[in-house]
Amino acid sequence: MIPRKAFLTKGTGVHKDRLASFELALRDAKIEKYNLVSVSSILPPNCKLVTREEGLSELKPGAIVHCVLARNDTNEPHRLMASAIGTAVPVNEDNYGYISEHHSFGEEEIIAGEYAEDLAATMLATTLGIEFNAEMAWHEREQVYKASGHIFDTFHICQTAAGDKNGKWTTVVAAMVFVTSKC
């Protein structure tokens, strides 16, 4: 079973119960109808990245759906949290890419998102044998990766939120969702 399509999504939920908060975050991301199975970090060869709407149109409620899921939650008022998915796509579509998940506290959306993107790009770069200086800033390494001719694109999706002011559970999710076959 190799996914032929994938899409990114994100969401936030707030509720007095932790599990219900997670459910509401999945609803916000539009993936609550599926039995989600978390998988690791490989973007399959020739897997087409599509819009959330296109991907969802091929799934049916109750389907077992694989995804790379980043999840974070808190009931601490005003605590900033993030969940991010980073993706690195190789030039040669017959090769696999990388997907990373990152969840953190205290990071703004751009910081958490770029961290996840950097992580995915670095994992792909090391498997392709691209030489780079790990001490370089992400934007400098990004240029090295793309100039190598092996990495076509990198991107991320990130959801941030501050914990509910009244101490309700707040959950953030970000996911790369795979579509294996039309349900």
Swiss-Prot record:
Keyword Lyase applies: yes
Known catalytic reactions: L-arginine + H(+) = agmatine + CO2
Gene3D superfamilies xref list: Pyruvoyl-Dependent Histidine Decarboxylase, subunit B
Cofactor(s) recorded in Swiss-Prot or TrEMBL: pyruvate
Transmembrane portions of the chain: none
GO molecular function: arginine decarboxylase activity
Top-level EC class: lyase
Keywords attached to this entry: Decarboxylase, Lyase, Pyruvate
InterPro entries: Pyr-dep_his/arg-deCO2ase, Pyr-dep_his/arg-deCO2ase_sand, Pyruvoyl-dep_arg_deCO2ase
Domain of life: Archaea
Residue(s) carrying Pyruvic acid (Ser): 41
EC number: 4.1.1.19
GO biological process: arginine catabolic process
Free-text comment on the cofactor: Binds 1 pyruvoyl group covalently per subunit.
Positions bearing the site annotation: Cleavage (non-hydrolytic): 40-41
Family in the record: Belongs to the PdaD family.
Annotated protein name in UniProt: Pyruvoyl-dependent arginine decarboxylase 2
Originating species: Methanosarcina acetivorans (strain ATCC 35395 / DSM 2834 / JCM 12185 / C2A)
Gene: pdaD2
